[in-house]
Amino acid sequence: VVVAGHMDEVGFMVRNIKPNGGIEVLPIGGLVGEVFISQIVYVYTKNGHKIPGVIGSIPPHLKTNNNSSIEALIVDIGASSKEEVLSYGISIGDMVLYDTPYIETFNGKRFIAKAIDNRYGCGLALEALEYFHDKTFDFNLAIGATVQEEVGLRGAETTTNMFKPDMFIALDASPLN
């Protein structure tokens, strides 16, 4: 038996740096473009910097087509040239994640945060490890966390190919209620 949460989250990846300093991004996971316009994001560089930015797109009155897709989004970090962006250590492939605070709901019964389903699943996996660590079973039990759930359940597939379990219990949560 394998029990696992997943520890990846949706986000973006730097795909191009424009001459004017705008950063074009690729979606990672199931994202809908227009909901991200004006959202604060951070570019995480390979040298450890966390650079703030905001997601924008070409204004409707300046568009030459009606492309409102996620691929049309641009991250603005305040740089005025490609050279300036590169001087910050930003490169193709860097992660871009949106910023969401971790807060309680007004009634104090729930939490609001990005990737809460992932965190919930990983937390349950840790609780299961703690609970079952000294128990004996007549079957093998593997507890952990997978990655790449947001891009096609790849980690869970790799785990099942590796362990060949009779049962895989995926720990995840609904984003609403």
Give the ranges of each region predicted by the language model:
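N-terminal hydrophobic/helix-forming segments and targeting peptides
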Residues: 1-177
